[in-house]
């Protein structure tokens, strides 16, 4: 593999993923020329969740799995699925645990919390989560200059869940809804050293999502919210604003939050170099 090849690194854990992420970070320090997209899959505790993860992996790319998994059955299932798809699948703790058990002649505990301690990275992440929640849906823009990432998009394009996912990774995120005929209250074009990214989506898929949303809210009389021409204008305006300012646009149609976040992190890392 050379520097022009991108590695999709999948970190899987039945806990918070902090342990496997820390090991991965240390390992990658030895390969700084390699471009890496990280996909973090936390609290995985069923074979169905493993199936979903494996179905989302793009097989025409370089993929690598690192994991911590306490349940023996789920761990074996993950390894079997990875073998079938010919993806390297490396446990980061099993060898150490096995060697300790053999050496001391003591069985491993029936349950263990694999989360890490309250270090600086932990508090940085908590701060990012608090900041991101406070700035969800265009709120509290008075200190937007403290954000690492600003996400724009029309309603129901996964802005909020993507923001929270990124916050868990330690990024301060502001997400701002773009609404027709309403001007932004801040001048984003003057923002320096901020990644600003727009989210767009297939119009038919967006209308379908919005209709489901209206049903759940028992507010099916909001015709403009799901009107094809109105929604089309919203999407076009988002693209126009982003293209005019040179901000990247991500099509989130059929993409998971993890995939959207991985793409945003890739843009962010490129901006830093």
From Swiss-Prot:
It catalyses: N(tele)-phospho-L-histidyl/L-threonyl-[pyruvate, phosphate dikinase] + ADP = N(tele)-phospho-L-histidyl/O-phospho-L-threonyl-[pyruvate, phosphate dikinase] + AMP + H(+); N(tele)-phospho-L-histidyl/O-phospho-L-threonyl-[pyruvate, phosphate dikinase] + phosphate + H(+) = N(tele)-phospho-L-histidyl/L-threonyl-[pyruvate, phosphate dikinase] + diphosphate. Pfam families: Kinase-PPPase. InterPro entries: Kinase-pyrophosphorylase, PPDK_reg. GO terms for molecular function: ADP binding; ATP binding; phosphotransferase activity, phosphate group as acceptor; protein serine/threonine kinase activity. Keywords: Kinase, Nucleotide-binding, Serine/threonine-protein kinase, Transferase. It is an enzyme of class 2 (transferase). ADP binds at residues 153-160. Its EC number is 2.7.11.32, 2.7.4.27. HAMAP family: PDRP. Bifunctional serine/threonine kinase and phosphorylase involved in the regulation of the pyruvate, phosphate dikinase (PPDK) by catalyzing its phosphorylation/dephosphorylation. Belongs to the pyruvate, phosphate/water dikinase regulatory protein family. PDRP subfamily. This is Putative pyruvate, phosphate dikinase regulatory protein. It comes from Ehrlichia canis (strain Jake).
